Amino acid sequence: MKENSCTACSRRLALFVGAAVLVVGCSSKTDVTLNRDKPLVFFNRQPSDPLTGKVDMAAMNWNDKTYYVGFDAKFGGSIQGKMILDFLASSESSVDRNGDGIIGYVLCIGDVGHNDSKVRTEGIRRALGTWTGSSDPGQAKEGQAVVGGKSYKVVELEGKAMTGTDGSTWNTNSATESMGSWVAKFADKIDLVISNNDGMAMGCLQASNYPRGLPIFGYDANADAVESVGKGELTGTVSQNVDAQAVAVLQIIRNLLDGSSGEDVVANGISRPDAHGNKISAPVQYWEDVKAIMADNSEVTSANWKEYTRGARDAGVRQVSAPTKKVLLTVHNASNDFLASAYLPALKHYAPLLNVDLTVVQGDGQNELSCLDKFTNLDMFDAFAVNMVKTNSGADYTDKLKY
């Protein structure tokens, strides 16, 4: 065979005892897609600088098939803040438990380096007038709110990042322990408990000395949290429309693998019907500057909690007839309440409808290698969906996709 007679050949050298065998297989260049050219969708944790929150555009511009799917976190923080203000405005003076004219609150912070945690804390503090320009613990000033037509001072008694003994953030056990300490320290000075997510809020409720009826607000609309709202235990939470996010992750991949380009990638089946008539029902937006699909948020209270109960899926997404594609998906923490109880079940519900064969690998929530070490056999997959442990780890994944 002449050297140039099979320019698209791949050559692999197999060594055997006492012999070397040259294996030559010919295939068309168009038959092979390099990993670096495959769709890559980051989700739930936007590639970004953990200190400044600036989006990591090097990761987002890895290739022209790289996108992020999340939710409008800043708007969500505002929704949570407004929900708390509305609650106070409609409350009686007895919400001030010790009658000192001050609404005191404690704050469970998820992760000081996480964009979602930052903007949720900002939304809360802006609404209550305690915002100083920083989302860090201890950085709050005296604010003001109206309770039953009367103005009250608002004080953040303490804000704390809930980090577990294993280093994991957004930690439920840490929230339980902290709540117990807060009750012992502040007693009836605590008028509200506010949390960056439902997992920590539910952890607070598990404290043995949690004051019965003390108002508490979470975020995520996890199934157990929504049920808790219905029981009158949790005062309110915020839905980030996880079904819309899960469908968007899969739909973008489906669009790219089906050959869509340009606006069709981020619109078909998302903001307008695709060829199968599918379209996400909840409001979503495309932020072109950061290549992100963002779902809207909504508050969940005693007035509407039944609309968010488990099992309500998007009727706008139905079975498609497209070829099955294989996708490797990472989850940063197998123990994360939101991902385990809401996001993954949604992904697993919609993936078969879009003929996406998901392989899910899960990490421990603290060490990126717990995901990266399972981010293997990449040639077997048509696309990748990545939920990182740390928001600045985008390059760790794209480095593995170079070839």
Swiss-Prot record:
Q: Which UniProt keywords apply?
A: Cell membrane, Lipoprotein, Membrane, Palmitate, Signal, Sugar transport, Transport
Q: Which PROSITE patterns would you find in this protein's record?
A: PROKAR_LIPOPROTEIN (PS51257)
| Xref: InterPro entries | Bact_Solute-Bind_Prot2 (IPR050555), MglB-2_Peripla_BP (IPR040740), Peripla_BP_I (IPR028082), SBP_2_dom (IPR025997)
Q: What is its main location?
A: membrane
What is its biological role? Answer: May be involved in the transport of sugars. May have a role in chemotaxis.
Which topology term describes how it sits in the membrane?
A: Lipid-anchor
Q: What gene name is listed for this protein? A: mglB
**PANTHER family in the record, alphabetically?**
D-GALACTOSE_METHYL-GALACTOSIDE BINDING PERIPLASMIC PROTEIN MGLB, D-XYLOSE-BINDING PERIPLASMIC PROTEIN
Enumerate the SUPFAM superfamilies for this protein. Answer: Periplasmic binding protein-like I (SSF53822)
Check the record and name the Gene3D superfamilies matching this protein: 3.40.50.2300
Subcellular localization is given as:
Cell membrane
Q: Where is the signal peptide?
A: 1-25
Q: Which organism is it from?
A: Treponema pallidum (strain Nichols)
The similarity annotation says:
Belongs to the bacterial solute-binding protein 2 family.
What is this protein's name? Glucose/galactose-binding lipoprotein
GO terms assigned for molecular function:
carbohydrate binding
Does Lipoprotein show up as a keyword for this record? yes
